[in-house]
Regions:
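N-terminal anchoring/stem segment of glycosyltransferases
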Residues: 6-98, 240-241, 269, 273-309
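Soluble or luminal CAZymes and related metallo-dependent hydrolases
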Residues: 50-54, 108-112, 224-228
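Aromatic-rich, lipid-facing transmembrane alpha helices and their immediate juxtamembrane interface loops
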Residues: 59, 105-109, 147, 151-168, ...
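N-terminal cationic-hydrophobic initiation segments that often serve targeting/anchoring roles
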Residues: 63-66, 118-121, 236
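GT-A fold catalytic core of metal-dependent nucleotide-sugar glycosyltransferases
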Residues: 80-81, 116-160
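Active-site-proximal specificity loops/subdomain of glycosyltransferases
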Residues: 81-122
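Long, charge-rich alpha-helical interaction segments
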Residues: 152-223
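C-terminal catalytic/acceptor-binding lobe
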Residues: 211-309
Length: 309
């Protein structure tokens, strides 16, 4: 009699590992305020660095809706900037001095910080960069942000930079074109304003190519000559490593959004992601909106996450 050898079948499952990087400023921190006023000779701008108290809900949204995340890195200027509720066993605290050359410190310019995020120790190849006004509201999958080694985000073309932010976008696109040896045209790219899917190796590659140009663009506070995070995202796109697909997100400007519409969306979201953008507000409206937003977020995400003590 003949006996067939047992056949063993191996199924290879690719596990997508993604990190998140969050930059954060606590404008009420006396240590930070002292540095800001000393190095800029300007009073702290209330709107620019105002704390809405919503950071815990960003972390809760990650815990509930993004279970595929390997590690969260929180980038701050000093340890005094780290909220007391942060669980440091679950959140990697990254100080500016850990990634930014000493010659550019201290910095109060988010675009300067964005030039060096790829230098975070133990950062995964695929990482999402979140501003602290962006929130995952519904269940997300890793494939929503990365597919077959490519980032997924919407890219649009623009002709005229109507404000400083768009000037930074144009600067960044032109520099990215230089990085791939391409002459930029009249238009410039602007990625969708949501969490950015970055590839660490491509960021390192471009930084090595354009180190002098990047360093020359850096200022302590924002100026028209700055580059921003889209330098890297545009380069990744030009290298053929972006799937041009818009993320399902809702954008609110606090200057025009009503308390009712904010509350309704946060408690019953219709999009995976949300950006709630701060603008100059009077004290009365700030207090009203903050109360509404915190109430709604606490209804949406009532349970503490592993990122909190």
């Amino acid at each position: 009699m003949r006996f067939r050898s047992p056949c063993t079948i191996f199924v290879v499952v690719k596990i997508c590992i993604v990190d998140i990087v969050i930059t954060y400023v606590d404008g009420l921190d006396p240590v930070w305020q002292k540095d800001y006023e000393r190095y800029t000779n300007q009073p702290v701008l209330e709107k620019r660095f105002r704390d809405w108290g919503t950071l815990p809900y960003l972390f809760r949204g990650i815990a509930v809706n993004m279970p595929f995340i390997r590690k969260v890195h929180l980038v701050v200027s000093h340890y005094s900037q780290v909220p007391a509720w942060i669980n440091r066993d679950e959140v990697n605290i990254v100080l500016h001095r850990d990634i930014i050359p000493e010659e550019f410190l201290p910095t109060f310019n988010s675009t300067a910080i964005e030039m060096f995020l790829h230098r975070i120790a133990d950062l995964d190849e695929e990482f999402l960069y979140f501003n602290d006004d962006m929130y995952p509201m519904l269940e997300c999958r890793a494939e929503d942000f990365f597919r077959d080694g490519k980032g997924v985000i919407g890219m649009s073309s623009h002709f005229w930079p109507s404000n400083m932010y768009k000037i930074h976008c144009r600067n960044s696109y032109r520099a990215a074109c230089h990085g791939v040896g391409r002459k930029p045209g009249l238009c410039f790219l602007r990625p969708q304003h949501i969490c950015s899917p970055m590839l660490k190796s491509k960021c390192e590659e471009l930084y090595d190519r354009l180190r002098e140009q990047i360093h020359a663009s850096i200022t302590r506070v924002r100026s028209n000559g700055n580059l921003n995070q889209y330098l890297y995202l545009d380069y990744i796109y030009l290298e053929g490593k972006i799937v041009n697909k818009r993320q399902p997100k809702k954008h609110f400007s606090l200057g025009v959004a009503s308390a009712k519409s904010l509350c309704q969306f946060i408690m019953h979201p219709t999009h995976q992601l949300a950006c709630i953008n701060d603008v100059q507000l009077g004290e009365e409206r700030f207090v009203e909106l903050k109360k509404t937003i915190l109430y709604a977020f606490n209804q949406r995400f009532p349970q503490k996450s592993k990122f909190e003590v």
